[in-house]
Amino acid sequence: MSKKPKVGMWSGLTAVTAVLTAGAIVGTTVAYHYTTTVNNYLDADTYKIIKGDSDEDTEYFKSDFTSDEERESYEAELCAQVEAEGAALLKNDNNALPLASGAKVSLFGHGSVDLMYGGTGSGSVDTSKAPNFKQALEDQGIQVNSTLWDLYSSDDMMKNYSRITPAAISDTLEANTQYAVNEAPWSKLSSAESSFADYGDAAIVVFSRSGGEGADLPSGENGTNDSWIKGQEGDGNYLALSAEEKELLQNLKTLKDNGTFKKIIVLINSSNAIEMDFLNPEICGEDYGIDSAMWIGDVGQTGINGVAQLLAGEATPSGSLVDSYLYDNMANPAMYNFYTQAYPNAADYNLLTDGPDVQGMYSVYQEGIYLDYRYYETRYEDAVMGTGNAGDYNWSTTVAFPFGYGDSYTTFEYSDFNVTESADAFNVTLKVTNTGSTYSGKETVQLYFQSPYTDYDKANGIEKASAELCGFAKTDILAPGASETVNITVDKSELRTYDANNAKTYIVDAGDYYFTAATDAHNAVNNILAAKGYTVENTDGRMTADGNVALTYKWTNAALDSTTYATSETGTAITNLFDEADPNKSSSEPGEVTWLSRSNWVATFPTQPVVLNATQTLADHLAFTRYDGSKADSVEMPTLGADNGLALVSMIGADYDDPQWDTLLDQLTFNEMVNTITLGFHNTAAIESIGKTRTKDENGPQGLTAALTGGASAMCYTSEDVMAATFNVDLINDVGRCIGEDCLAMGYSGLYGPGINMHRTAYSGRNFEYYASDPFVAGTICAAEVNGIQSKGVYVYLKHVALNDSESSRRGVNTWLNEQAAREIYLEVADKAVTDGGAWSVMSGFNRWGAYWCGAYDNLLTGFLRGELGMRGMIITDYSGSSKYMDLADGLIAGSDIWDSPDPTIHTTLAPKYENDAYIVTEMRESMHKILYTVANSNAMNGWSSADRLKVITPWWKTALYALDTVLAVLTVLCIWRLVVAIKRKKTWTAEQAANTVNAQNQQ
């Protein structure tokens, strides 16, 4: 043997192939473990359709567009229109807006080059194709200072002075350390200062704030300290102007005073209400010289084009605020209990924090029904009338811009207000006239009512707001001098209130009810005060302005009615369902809460967080699993795996109670049910036994987005608050239709959205995903959007039902409130979306109602959603992963149907123990009924005929990974074999070399 065997080479190759094989096997194991996630990300086929002979028209849901290009072009214009109709003009001194044609402007603030298009987390959107602000303005003929733009856009500025927001979903209060305004100091703009005079028609400042999933915004109060605003001077309040932003305004005011700039315009690019003290010199102590201000929310993909149209006068503002904007956000009574806290004695009961899951954290909705304007305007009325111990409350130094406020470039006059009563409704007409001389525009008409606050209410702990929105309408574009009569119908059920302590159902109080048409909630209360005889003069100036009696109507209810609305439209008796979420009534007995009450504002206004304590009963209720198996034999085991030959396509349009469903459900196997129910992450599984296709479900509060799962995304519309601020039902119905079109075009059948939680405070991380602080406008707009989405065969999952109004410690937080607040505020959006919009499905949430996870709270899911509202579709959990408290058995029993989880832990370890539990298997079967009923009536059935069948297949990536593992394993074995051979040969070669050496020495 002449050549030395290559032991080193084969040793190295063996090591490499062994490592690669081990890595591949580990990777394959992980990928197989998260099969659902990988299938979603790769959009991998898990089945094939075996086509039968049929000439049926199987396009059950059709597109209204002839091409993707036509759809995308239409949607781009639609998004801009939503922004143009939703943006609210707050201030416009001396007609600073619109800008003159060809105006030359300078854009200031980091937000000008880095707009907020939407928030972060599961609702985040792809904005790679979105126009920037400069492009949008230039398209309107406005010239933009390129020197300043390039400076803000430079690598140095983007690196050092970009706002800091949570980069990923997190779940703890500490996540807020990632928030920072981080505006550039004025000194950093010096290199562009010489360009200002040439672009001095206006200085346009953009103040942006970001929210995101998993992290609430810091307020600087209740433990949220100033370290959370990294490197910035300030008090830790993310929604106040930072020192650098104030410095920017100060310097612009100086330049305005010396003639460099003619006007200063501020745009509020945020879905979280920024404190507005800087717009009022009497409040903040400094005049920043701001001429005009406009709230634009989060603009979506093309909404900035709508903003540019407004600034250029191509469109006239007609949006109305869906939150009250304050000078100091701590004036909101909800702020004192907004951030979660721990039970002081949680450790005594071993209430755990298990990863992100929590047992011992809680939040109290001590403000009750007094959310946003329901507080500000009610306490104002009491202060005017001298009732309710309102104290020294001063509306004018509290509220900068009331709920519903929105100015215009023109003026409108209301006249001929008329209300007629029918058996079930009030029918309102109002003439609206454009009294301006220059600009055409739309006007939003808002209708409010006031319910009497009676002795019965005071005796029974019922609270009443001084004004509640009960209807609205938006005119067409009115030219100067033109008029339109709008019609608004108010169902009499809007007048009901919930009596949780005596009648324990909905009542309509005896007494006088007032209706009024108004431009905002504050004017509504002034109109009602005027109808009661109050004026600025006879209240010694406590009234901010005289109201208009001509825009009011009084209706008197002779006697208290506790029967008309005591039964829902489904025939279900309505009575208390949520006592367990009320600390004063819960069997957990965590402590007493004094709810905010207009019977005595001063004595009941929160001044510090409510302290509750854990009890043994509370700890028992908080157990991760409550079902003990005792009902296993209480029912007969349902039929499984029958060969009935029925396919899901045969059930299209079938009634939920059709007997054929039992025939179909009998065909399911236990494993098919478990696979579908426990692995519902962004899909419902393919089922061979009944020919059910796999569906794709995706996020979408602002439009279809696969930001988290890696699939296709579509048009990103404005944030939901901008949609609501349009007060335009038809427009948002069209948005919904187009979202449905996107889903139809991209193969999605379900949408995780719209978001239906409330703007409880300005600091919730996900306010951009939710419509408003008022449940009426939120519910009405949501119902319109839902109707549009589902018209294209896309089932919505309303999220989240309910009380997911904050992000801190959200996984398992104990949420406490009273039933009146639950029903009148926090469940009202779901009510309207289901009953008026026809929403198929809902997503529950991470939170608990009291001690009960909302996905395992029977009274919420079965009692309210299915019983009172009649919802027939499926209920999905929020992302469950391996969260222990989102228990399978408890959830199924309460009414949850499918777990938003890619983790097969439940599938492989938990579910099998119930295979012989007839009670749980029966609950699984009923969940499958709801899932299949929903899917059968969706666009998932497009292309399916009654003759088609389905075959479940192994997705290509599994085959590829198996092949890769096999090839690497074979290579490793070959390398090992060659290494062994090489080692043996080396021994022989070494011996030969030694012998040759000896022979050579002997020959010498």
Kindly give the residue locations of the regions a language model identified:
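Terminal connector regions
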Residues: 492-565
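Glycoside hydrolase catalytic-domain context in secreted enzymes
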Residues: 1-498, 507-515, 521, 569-1004
